[in-house]
C-alpha cells in the first residue's frame, strides 16, 4: 500500500512569534525517587560506619548501586531518555552515555567521569576502597536530587496561543508509552492555525510533523484541547491537525531545553531554536 501523501505537514516556525505560553501541566510521579533516597541514605550510613568491615562496605556499595538503579528507572519511565536516538548516539544501550548527553550528570573532569562510571559498572566480588565508595555515594546523592528536580519541573503539556488571534492554538504533549519493560517517549502536536502557515511539501525553517490527521469539526468537538474552537473551521482559512514529531534530534533538543534550567526552559522564544536545523 502506498504512503499517504498527507501523512506529513510542515508548520511555519513564525507561528510561535508573538505567542504567549500557558496551560502547562505536570503530572509526573516521583514516588520512586523517595525510595531511591531511602536506599541511598541507608547505604551511605552503612559505608560511613563500616569500620573496615569489608562485608558491611560491600553491603553499602551494592545498596548504592541499587539506589542508582531505582532512580534511573524513574527517569526512564518518565522521560525515556535512553530511547531517544539522537545524532551521535553510539550504542543502543549505554545509559551512562545518555545521562552525559542530556547533562543529567555533570563531572568536573573526564578522569572523574570514567572513575564514577567504572564504580557503577563494578562487578568484582570485593568492593572498591572506602574512599571510592564515599565518592560514589556523593555522586549518587547528587544524581537523585537532580532527577527529582527534573521530574518536578518537566512540563508534559504546553500551549502556545495568540491574544490577537483566538483561533490560533498549538499544543505539545510529551507522552510516555510502555512496551514490555521499556518506555518510549512521544512528542505529539495538536494545532489550529491559519492555512497559510502550513505546507504539505518540505520547506526550510518549517517544523516537520509526521503521521498527521487533519481534524474536521466533529474531530475538534471530541478533542481534548480544541473542543471550544470547533466553530473556527467555519472559516476556510483555518486548519486543525494532530500529529507527532518523529525527528529524534528535535525530540532531544526539546527535552534538553525542558530539563536544564540554564537553557531557560521552553517558551515562545526558545521553542523556535528547537526546530532550527542550523
Tell me the role of every PLM-derived stretch:
Residues 42-45, 78, 132-183:
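Amphipathic, Lys/Arg-enriched alpha-helical patches that create a basic surface
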Residues 42-50, 90-98, 118-122:
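Short, charged/polar, low-complexity loop and linker segments
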Amino acid at each position: 500500500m502506498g504512503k499517504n501523501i498527507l501523512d506529513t505537514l510542515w508548520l511555519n516556525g513564525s507561528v510561535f512569534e508573538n505567542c504567549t505560553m500557558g496551560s502547562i501541566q505536570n503530572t509526573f510521579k516521583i514516588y520512586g525517587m523517595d525510595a531511591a533516597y531511602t536506599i541511598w541514605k541507608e547505604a551511605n550510613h552503612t559505608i560511613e560506619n563500616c569500620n573496615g568491615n569489608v562485608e558491611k562496605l560491600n553491603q553499602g556499595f551494592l545498596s548504592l548501586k541499587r539506589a542508582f538503579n531505582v532512580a534511573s528507572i524513574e527517569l526512564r519511565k518518565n522521560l525515556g531518555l535512553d530511547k531517544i536516538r539522537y545524532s551521535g548516539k553510539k550504542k543502543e544501550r549505554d545509559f551512562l552515555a545518555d545521562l552525559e548527553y542530556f547533562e543529567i550528570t555533570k563531572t568536573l573532569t573526564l578522569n572523574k567521569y570514567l572513575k564514577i562510571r567504572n564504580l557503577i559498572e563494578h562487578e568484582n566480588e570485593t568492593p572498591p576502597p572506602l574512599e571510592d565508595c564515599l565518592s560514589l555515594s556523593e555522586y549518587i546523592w547528587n544524581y537523585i536530587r537532580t532527577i527529582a528536580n527534573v521530574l518536578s519541573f518537566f512540563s508534559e503539556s504546553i500551549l502556545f496561543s495568540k491574544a490577537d488571534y483566538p483561533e490560533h492554538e498549538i499544543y505539545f504533549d510529551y507522552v510516555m508509552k510502555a512496551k514490555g519493560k521499556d518506555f518510549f517517549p512521544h512528542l505529539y502536536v495538536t494545532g489550529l492555525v491559519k492555512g497559510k502557515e502550513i505546507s504539505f511539501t518540505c520547506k526550510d525553517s518549517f517544523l516537520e510533523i509526521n503521521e498527521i490527521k487533519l481534524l474536521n469539526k466533529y474531530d475538534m468537538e471530541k478533542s481534548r484541547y480544541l473542543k471550544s474552537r470547533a466553530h473556527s473551521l467555519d472559516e476556510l482559512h483555518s486548519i486543525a491537525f494532530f500529529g507527532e514529531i518523529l525527528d529524534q534530534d528535535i525530540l532531544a533538543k526539546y527535552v534538553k531545553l525542558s530539563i536544564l534550567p540554564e537553557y531557560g526552559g521552553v517558551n515562545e522564544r526558545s521553542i523556535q531554536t528547537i526546530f532550527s536545523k542550523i
